[in-house]
Curated annotation (Swiss-Prot):
Function field: Catalyzes the attachment of threonine to tRNA(Thr) in a two-step reaction: L-threonine is first activated by ATP to form Thr-AMP and then transferred to the acceptor end of tRNA(Thr). Also edits incorrectly charged L-seryl-tRNA(Thr).
Enzyme kind, highest EC tier: ligase
Catalysed reactions listed for this entry: tRNA(Thr) + L-threonine + ATP = L-threonyl-tRNA(Thr) + AMP + diphosphate + H(+)
NCBIfam families xref list: PRK03991.1 (NF003068), thrS (TIGR00418)
Binding note for cofactor: Binds 1 zinc ion per subunit.
A Pfam match: tRNA-synt_2b
EC nos: 6.1.1.3
Gene assigned in the entry: thrS
A biological process from GO: threonyl-tRNA aminoacylation
Name of the protein this chain belongs to: Threonine--tRNA ligase
Organism for this UniProt entry: Thermococcus onnurineus (strain NA1)
Length: 627
């Protein structure tokens, strides 16, 4: 199936003549139709859809729901349109598919019209013309997609049938069945447990961070790409770049060696083929000549292949290797895509540690657990902002209970436990720090796993002190989680504060503009530029509002942009060589020396990376990225 989706002020049609010998029977009323404020969906049902029409209907409805939620459309016009494909389905099947799409959309609560099938029709529409107003989608039944997914049905069935046992573990070491735990005072943990146990990942509403990322001109949808691939405006790119630099510096400081590896890999590589079969995922497929490649969904592949070829001694262990993948790819279901929370292309800080044995692996695991807490603290997320999940087998719990309890003690609050009777995955122990957002959806940030399979699968060995080659254990660690997820968590946290009447703010080191200088008139613009120059020389991101707006409007504009410090300069400040500063954090305003402000800002940003201002100095020189 092929669909063209156009967000329109209106769509109207009028039947002119038969296009088929036996078109759909229609009443006089159905010969004309009109809907306003509508998502117009032009559909070609294709021959391949005949293999599984029910699945095509379901996928099409999910895609339409996804787009409708993004453009906030309640009215949907289903319009048969044969001109999107040269391989059309039989008319009777095509009509049935269109009817099913119409009916299921109605069941989802949409106001739906469908243009009649098998006729020549005149139509008019008025496209709204915003970035998401014109989109196309291709729906492929799984019978066709199966060759690309390369996921053995038996393995998927085995994973689906895996039974999880859920508990809450307290810092005191008490393991309580989740339905018997008193969640009083642990509301976010309750929400997280419900989310994990239900396993529902469909996003039915737009999370607040999407509004913020658009209003602040940070990130936007890219209609020219596949859904889940985003565009970053200058301010968003600065935040993302600083986060990338910060996490990388933390991991290198921890002792990891930074590498770079390819983004695509051969399906037929023996080690990779085994890994794919053991670790089902939805891949993007790339063909080069007769060979088929998949786009990586993690840095594991490249780092494992480097380690396979390396000569490693026990003296080198633990051996830590790191890459910031820009990008990793995973074809998430369209209904699961949600702003910065769940994407198809994402930036993943990925460290893999070769450990000699379980004792060394567990010691590293605890260190990386603490490293992850430290990394999140730097971006403004404390243990109060996220919930912990720890996952393992029953045998591992029985043999290492004190170690697991120690993890709960370190975080200082109850944690969610997922336990299995037997091991299905490649790891024996895993934790994640999960952020619960304003829609009660959870997203994993930091994570570490102890992998007991892939050293042997990839042929990764080390020479022990007895001279023999042995297989190590491997830790997978992302101390922050995907960079986009970190941005999502920061914005969602600020949305929560905003709902409580607290002014939202970025951490100062991440603020795209840290100081705005506002001259009260053009005659003191030269002094405003002098102040800005001094701040810029001290590696502080500063801009100057040189527009003709009134002073109050300039201040409101800075408030809307979450500027941490606003400096107002007039004739008095110029004559006395001082500045008047308004702080967003506490609302206080006062006169001070410029050098004192520089010291104040530098004391808060010390130890964090710096990038220069991402936009022109003067506001009058800036483009607007969103209308």
């Amino acid at each position: 199936m092929r669909m063209l989706l156009i967000h329109s002020d209106y769509l109207e049609y009028e039947v002119k003549d038969k296009a088929l010998k036996n078109p759909e029977p229609i009443s006089e009323e159905q010969k004309k139709g009109r809907l306003e404020e509508v998502l117009a969906v032009f559909i070609s049902v294709e021959k391949v859809d005949e293999t599984n029409p029910d699945e095509v209907v379901e996928k099409a409805v999910n895609e339409i729901k996804d787009v409708a939620s993004q453009v906030k459309a309640e009215n949907v016009f289903v319009y048969p349109f044969a001109h999107l494909s040269s391989e059309l389905a039989k008319p009777d099947i095509a009509l049935e598919v269109l009817r099913e799409v119409e009916e299921k959309l109605r069941e989802e609560g949409f106001n739906v019209k469908r243009a009649p099938f098998g006729y020549y029709k005149a139509f008019k529409l008025s496209c709204k013309g915003h970035p998401l107003a014109e989109l196309s989608r291709t729906i492929v039944p799984s019978g066709e997609a199966k060759a690309e997914e390369e996921i053995p049905e038996a393995l998927k069935k085995e994973e689906e049938e895996l039974v999880s046992y859920w508990y809450i573990l307290t810092p005191e070491g008490e393991l309580i069945e989740v339905d018997k735990f008193d969640f009083t005072g642990h509301e976010n943990l309750r929400k997280f447990a419900n989310y994990e146990i239900s396993k529902s990942r469909i996003a039915d509403r737009e999370p607040p961070h999407v509004r913020i990322m658009l209003e602040q001109e940070l990130v936007d949808y890219e209609p020219g790409s596949d859904p889940g691939n985003l565009r970053y405006y200058p301010k968003g790119r600065l935040i993302k770049g600083l986060l990338e630099q910060y996490v990388t510096e933390k991991v290198v400081e921890y002792g990891a060696m930074e590498v770079e590896t390819p983004i695509m890999y051969d399906f037929e590589h023996p080690a990779l083929e085994k890994y794919l079969n053991r670790f089902p995922a939805r891949q993007y497929i790339v063909k080069s000549g007769d060979k088929k490649f998949f786009l990586r969904f993690a840095a594991c592949f490249g780092q494992f292949l480097i380690k396979k070829d390396a000569i490693i001694s026990y003296r080198n262990l633990p051996l830590r290797m790191y890459e910031l993948t820009r990008y990793s790819f995973r074809r998430e279901k369209s209904g699961e895509l949600s702003g910065l929370r769940r994407l198809r292309a994402f930036t993943m800080p990925d460290m893999h540690t070769v450990a000699r044995d379980l004792k060394q692996a567990m010691a590293e695991f605890k260190k990386q657990y603490k490293l992850s807490m430290e990394v999140l603290k730097g971006v403004g997320l404390t243990p109060e902002d996220y919930e912990v999940a720890i996952r393992f087998t029953e045998d591992f719990w029985n043999e290492n209970r004190d170690f697991i309890v120690e993890l709960a003690k370190i975080i200082g609050k109850p944690v969610l436990i997922e336990m299995w009777k037997q091991r299905f995955f490649y790891f024996i122990l895993k934790f994640e720090f999960n952020f619960v957002d304003n829609l009660d959806k959870a997203a994993a940030l930091s994570t570490v796993q102890i992998d007991v399979e892939n050293a042997e699968r990839f042929g990764i060995t080390y020479y022990d002190e007895d001279g023999k080659e042995k297989y190590p254990l491997i830790l997978h660690c992302s101390p922050s989680g995907a960079i986009e997820r970190v941005m999502y968590a920061i914005l969602e946290k600020q949305a929560k504060l905003q709902s409580k009447g607290i002014k939202p703010m970025f951490p100062l080191w991440l603020s795209p503009i840290q100081v705005r200088v506002i001259p009260v008139s053009e005659e003191v613009l030269d002094y405003a530029l002098y102040v800005a120059g001094k701040l810029e020389g001290a590696k502080i991101r500063v801009d100057v509002d040189d527009t003709s707006d009134r002073l109050n409007k300039k201040i409101r504009k800075a408030e809307k942009e979450w500027i941490p410090y606003v400096i107002v300069v007039g004739r008095n400040e110029k004559e006395q060589n001082t500045i008047t500063v308004r702080r967003r954090s506490d609302g206080k305003q006062g006169e001070m020396q410029l050098e004192d402000l520089i010291r104040e800002i530098r004391s808060q940003t010390e130890g964090f990376p710096y990038k220069p201002r991402p936009l022109p100095l003067l506001l009058s020189k800036r483009p607007k990225f969103r209308g």
